[in-house]
Curated annotation (Swiss-Prot):
It comes from Clostridium acetobutylicum (strain ATCC 824 / DSM 792 / JCM 1419 / IAM 19013 / LMG 5710 / NBRC 13948 / NRRL B-527 / VKM B-1787 / 2291 / W). GO terms for cellular component: HslUV protease complex. Residues 411-432 are annotated as: Disordered. Residues 1-53 form the ClpX-type ZB domain. InterPro entries: AAA+_ATPase, ATP-dep_Clp_protease_ClpX, ATPase_AAA_core, Clp_ATPase_C, Clp_protease_ATP-bd_su_ClpX, ClpX_bact, P-loop_NTPase, Znf_CppX_C4. Belongs to the ClpX chaperone family. The gene is clpX. This is ATP-dependent Clp protease ATP-binding subunit ClpX. Pfam families: AAA_2, ClpB_D2-small, zf-C4_ClpX. SMART domains: AAA, ClpB_D2-small, zf-C4_ClpX. NCBIfam families: clpX, PRK05342.1. Keywords: ATP-binding, Chaperone, Metal-binding, Nucleotide-binding, Zinc.
Length: 432
């Protein structure tokens, strides 16, 4: 409401200054605002919407520089790292070209499909890439997605995660990277069209088509279905790089059936699963194999770059444990270093851990669980012992959970408590 003093003089509705105290007083329906308050409001709005530094795609590192950075964190997978480095470099070159060039030639987007067994580094590769490029990055799980109108997440929620990670800066989010994990789980359940609606398989593939290709999508800022009257955020997905990853368990059999020369009888060679090199088989993959697996042709067409990853052998897993900048062994060394204790893993111990991960078929992802199990008792006892200088984990420690301890000079060795022998029963004496 308009404010008046005793002499009926007009006053600013915001700061309360009278008409005589300001240069200008602007009237609205029942309210007044002075020039000083207008200037203050203008400054507040300018600070609120101050432009954030944009991604300088012009100064993007070269493919060799991208690969060198990936080498510091990711062990092996040389072909995959090369392919990803080139694909990402070309993607941001394309953005730069389309923004600055008025040429008739418009460069089209090339999304990426990563294939490889579980625990081979698909997700980690995408995370490391986004960290190096300093662009907004989001990871989505394809298993939670359903068609619009059914229980589950809409495909637009993937874009919402990217916008949130860009602090709701839509322009910055439009140059980000989205990694969709478990993409093989939305494959069609059968090769033939079904009479029942496949809302979490083919239906999701159909819903993802326009987003992958490039469209202006309407994203609900509060997550969609529970708030139907909210205002939508408009985001253009044309310059968003989509990387889809999946294990595609069983596609190797489809490839083998296509490439193998069929032999039957005594001359037929039979290979066990352990003898097969899954990585070598996946390198022969063709779009037709993905079609048989359950991806629809339109979806395959929007993922033109197919990158295959090899399963990690014992040697590679040993390197994963010790070589990268954030290697698992280095993490535990740092944890014990905080207790002023040195930690050392012998080569035999690292090989035994790698062998256990292979037997569990968990790849690099399962290494932490194995090491955590070995280190549990060590990390429980060491903080309360001031006489221990160094802990050595050997191959024998993997089974016994008892490491070799190097004590401070002058400290007395403390033996581990021995298990009490069970008293012999009458039956044991008679059998003896």
């Amino acid at each position: 409401m308009a404010k008046y003093d005793n002499k009926k003089q007009l006053r600013c509705s915001f700061c309360g200054k009278s008409q005589d105290q300001v240069k200008r007083l602007i009237a609205g329906p029942g309210v007044y605002i002075c020039d000083e308050c207008i200037e203050l409001c203008s400054e507040i709005i300018a600070d609120e919407f101050e432009e954030t530094p944009q991604i300088n795609v012009g100064s993007l590192p070269k493919p060799s520089e991208i690969k060198d950075y990936l080498d510091q964190y990711v062990v092996g997978q040389e072909d995959a790292k090369k392919s990803l480095s080139v694909a990402v470099y070309n993607h941001y070159k394309r953005i730069n070209s389309n923004l600055s060039n008025n040429d008739d030639i418009e460069l089209q987007k090339s999304n990426i499909l990563l294939l490889g067994p579980t625990g081979c580094g698909k997700t980690f590769l995408a995370q490391t890439l986004a960290k190096f490029l300093n662009v907004p990055f989001a990871i989505a799980d394809a298993t939670t997605l359903t068609e619009a109108g059914y229980v589950g997440e809409d495909v637009e929620n993937i874009l919402l995660k990217l916008i949130q990670n860009a602090d709701y800066d839509v322009e910055r989010a439009e140059k980000g990277i989205i990694y969709i994990d478990e993409i093989d789980k939305i494959a069609r359940k059968s090769e033939n069209p079904s009479i029942t609606r496949d809302v979490s398989g083919e239906g999701v593939q159909q819903a993802l088509l326009k987003i992958l290709e490039g469209t202006v999508a309407s994203v609900p800022p509060q997550g969609g279905r529970k708030h139907p009257h909210q205002e939508f955020i408009q985001i253009n997905t044309t310059n968003i790089l989509f990387i889809c990853g999946g294990a595609f368990d069983g596609v190797d059999k489809i490839i083998e059936n296509r490439t193998r020369v069929s032999t039957i009888g005594f001359g037929a060679s039979i290979q066990s699963k352990q003898q097969k090199d899954i990585g070598a088989i996946l390198k022969k993959i063709m779009p037709g194999d993905l079609l048989k697996f359950g991806l629809i042709p339109e979806f395959i067409g929007r993922l033109p770059i197919i990158v295959t990853l090899n399963s990690l052998d014992q040697g590679a897993l040993v390197k994963v444990l010790s070589e990268p900048k954030n290697a698992l062994v280095k993490q535990y060394e740092k944890l014990l270093q905080m207790d002023n204790v040195e930690l050392e893993f012998k080569d035999g111990a690292l090989k035994a851990i790698a062998s256990e991960a292979i037997s569990r078929s968990t790849g690099a992802r399962g290494l932490r669980a194995i090491v955590e199990d070995i280190m549990k008792d060590i990390m429980f006892d060491i903080p309360s012992r001031e006489d221990v200088k160094k802990v050595i984990v050997t191959e024998n420690t993997i089974n016994t959970k008892q490491p070799e301890l190097v004590l401070e000079e002058g400290a007395k060795a403390i033996e581990a408590p021995k298990k009490k022998e069970k008293s012999k029963t009458k039956k044991d004496i008679e059998s003896a």
